[in-house]
């Protein structure tokens, strides 16, 4: 069975970069990222590995909702200037890069789902909790900085909802980190309580008469914003990748076919 290690490039690199005392020291960054990748390969022993990078195009989410990720700090200039050299160094280490047109998240999600559907195992290396929506027994998420897999049970307890309700929670309460709006006046706690009672968005919105007038009014007025927020939070898993697995092979394995759109 193929085991594909899928690294969220900027999630890893920017966290490492933030810990470097001298932000212009690209040599130190390269050494630390190389060491991290070497450790990832040693710990997980994958058959395939790829590091996925964000692109420069405006994402479809930003086009749909211009305030999406508004206020995010731009990439520090030294890192922006040194990124290509770092990527070349990783290529020399036989860690192939995949370049997304815009956001890496959708490419990572697509690659993970396609790997799992092909009876392989996908390990996503990222601290981004958004990947927890990929509810498949052959997909796991590894936090390199804490050296542990994402604890879904702990996340469910923290959020107050089941994994299958993650997107419904984002639709109602939004996500301040990504500037996903949710419904005005509905916070994470009240959203979790609503989902505990009604289980899903369709059931909730068809049961507004069972709620108090004030809360029902908020939900009714915010229904379209909830739909928008759901769409913004949902990862795309059906992008055309057109990659050949042999380009990302770490160890000897059987010849692989091209991963394409189903």
Curated annotation (Swiss-Prot):
Keyword annotations: DNA-binding, Endonuclease, Hydrolase, Magnesium, Metal-binding, Nuclease, Potassium
Residues that bind Mg(2+), according to the entry?
105
Q: Which GO terms describe its biological process?
A: DNA replication, Okazaki fragment processing
Instruction: Cite the residue spans of the region called Interaction with DNA.
Output: 185-190
UniProt cross-references to InterPro entries, sorted A to Z: 5-3_exonucl_a-hlix_arch_N, 5-3_exonuclease, 5-3_exonuclease_C_sf, DNA_polI_H3TH, FEN, HhH2, PIN-like_dom_sf, Xni
Q: Name the cofactor(s).
A: Mg(2+); K(+)
Annotated residues for binding of K(+): 172-173, 181, 183, 186
Q: Which residues form the 5'-3' exonuclease domain?
A: 162-259
User: Known EC number(s)?
Assistant: 3.1.-.-
Note describing how the cofactor binds: Binds 2 Mg(2+) per subunit. Only one magnesium ion has a direct interaction with the protein, the other interactions are indirect. Binds 1 K(+) per subunit. The potassium ion strongly increases the affinity for DNA.
**Keyword Flavoprotein among record annotations:** no
- Disulfide pattern: none
Gene3D superfamilies cross-referenced by the UniProt entry: 5' to 3' exonuclease, C-terminal subdomain, 5'-nuclease
Please list the GO terms describing molecular function.
5'-3' exonuclease activity; 5'-flap endonuclease activity; DNA binding; magnesium ion binding; potassium ion binding
Which SMART domains does the UniProt entry name for this protein? 53EXOc, HhH2
Query: What Pfam family does this protein match (any one)?
Result: 5_3_exonuc
For this chain, the family text in UniProt reads:
Belongs to the Xni family.
Please give the NCBIfam families that the UniProt record associates with this protein. Answer: PRK09482.1
Query: What task does this protein carry out?
Result: Has flap endonuclease activity. During DNA replication, flap endonucleases cleave the 5'-overhanging flap structure that is generated by displacement synthesis when DNA polymerase encounters the 5'-end of a downstream Okazaki fragment.
| Protein name per the record | Flap endonuclease Xni
Source species, please? Shewanella baltica (strain OS185)
